[in-house]
Swiss-Prot record:
This is Uncharacterized lipoprotein MJ0878. It comes from Methanocaldococcus jannaschii (strain ATCC 43067 / DSM 2661 / JAL-1 / JCM 10045 / NBRC 100440). The keyword Ubl conjugation does not apply. InterPro entries: ABC_Transporter_SBP, ABC_transptr_periplasmic_BD. One of its GO terms (cellular component) is plasma membrane. The keyword Signal applies.
Length: 414
């Protein structure tokens, strides 16, 4: 499952970002680490909830149907969420009526959900990650009654481990073969599901059984902060807007600080990828991974001329020809999956990054905790690219990889 998730997250749609320039609108970061753009004043909508996420829509209303923004301190009465498949949801507190203006604004095809949710099923550990961000009182994770792949891999969230062991959360099978009898028995208010891959089959079955699903397309976002901003979707379903605001503003602020800290650093060339039994995959130049490298961390990605929004499968010879001269080589996997790395990547010992000890891999918990700690992931990446700017910092998610004995240790910048 971890491998499938890793490949799936790499294969995403993203906004074009080239080294030294910013996609769409020019972005400036002032001394207070706040983003400003050159967009017209009319576009600076004070009621806009989402700054980075593009695959959903979220609107808040007062009781009279006026748009408000709780992230600016406004009081709300109703919420409208439009998921990645275009479904419209009116979210309201249990005792509140459906407002008279609902059909005028939403049409006839919308679903009403009482919030906060108390009984849900999730498809992925990355959904759990964003739920953890707003789980201050335990009620959000407490609402999770079923998880796909629940007992199929190690969990790095202690509360999930405990609830699975105690039977408070049920493993409802894999995403490719869910146990629908268990799912029906749980009778969830909502199943959070990823569209695409196995998710489309789950969506079809939910429609057949009359089970409400919400399509979470965080993994398709074009920016690491766009992925992280899906925390606001979960906040809407749990009335946790204040918690989401505190969490996201902290993550955003830390990420913007990285941009400011690295923008004047000398560029280093970065190879990202490796060869395995599944082939050699590399991020395309418009992928969120390439954006992390080039925009957030001021690196020079070796395949910045490879157009696309996800990942591309290339032959190893093509990869090696460029990677051999890269300053830094990031192997996007953990050592648990790299036992045949030396055999799969012939000639690696001649690579510049190998000779200079600048090969890095991912931590075991990267695919669970990484989304929750988006800012730490970006800070880690910046640290291994520009150690001179982060002296004394110890990494967690990107580890120094010892190819010869397939081990990895935290990197301390000097």
């Amino acid at each position: 499952m971890k491998k499938l998730l890793a490949i799936g997250i790499l294969c995403i749609m993203v906004t074009a970002v080239m080294s030294g320039c910013v996609s769409e609108k020019e972005i400036n970061i002032n001394n207070s680490n706040k983003i400003t753009t050159n967009m017209p004043v009319s576009e600076k909508n004070i009621t806009k909830i989402l700054k980075y996420a593009k695959n959903m829509n979220l609107i808040y209303y007062d009781e009279n149907g006026n748009i408000v923004n709780p992230y600016n301190g406004d009081k709300w009465k109703y919420k409208v969420f439009i998921d990645a498949t275009g479904q419209k949801f009116l979210l309201k507190n249990k005792d509140d009526p459906v407002p008279s203006w609902a059909k005028e604004k939403l049409g006839d095809n919308f679903k009403v959900i009482n919030v906060p949710l108390t009984r849900v099923i999730v498809m992925s550990s990355t959904e759990i990650a964003l739920m953890e961000a707003i789980n201050d009182d335990g009620s959000v994770i407490g609402s999770v009654k079923g998880i796909m792949w629940g007992k199929s891999y190690k969990w790095y969230f202690k509360d999930i481990n405990k609830s699975l062991a105690e039977g408070k959360i049920i493993d409802v099978g894999s995403s490719s073969n869910p146990n629908w009898d268990k799912i029906i028995e749980i009778n969830p208010q909502v199943i959070f599901v990823y569209p695409g891959y196995d998710g489309d089959k789950i969506i079809a079955k939910c429609k057949e059984l009359g089970i409400t699903y919400v399509a979470d397309a965080e993994y398709l976002e074009n920016d690491p902060l766009g992925r992280c901003e899906w925390v606001k979707m979960f906040a809407a379903f749990y009335n946790k807007e204040p918690e989401a605001k505190r969490y996201f503003e902290k993550v955003e602020d830390n990420c913007l600080k990285v941009i400011n800290k690295t923008k004047n650093c000398p560029k280093v060339t970065v190879a990202w990828g490796y060869n395995s039994q599944w082939g050699c995959y590399v991020p395309e130049n418009n992928s969120y991974v390439a954006k992390e490298i080039m925009f957030y961390c001021n690196g020079d990605y070796i395949f910045k001329d490879l157009n696309g929004t996800g990942s591309a499968k290339i032959n190893y010879e093509t990869f090696a020809e460029r990677a051999k001269d890269a300053d830094v080589w990031v192997v996007p996997s953990s050592t648990a999956w790299l036992s045949t790395f030396k055999e799969d990547n012939p000639g690696y010992e001649t690579f510049k990054a190998v000779k200079n000890g600048r090969v890095f891999c991912e931590s075991d918990d990267y695919w669970q905790l990484g989304l929750l700690k988006t800012d730490e992931v970006i800070m880690d990446l910046a640290t291994i690219l520009h150690p001179e700017a982060f002296k004394g910092r110890k990494t967690h998610f990107f580890l120094k990889y010892n190819i010869e004995n397939n081990t990895a240790t935290p990197f301390i910048a000097k």
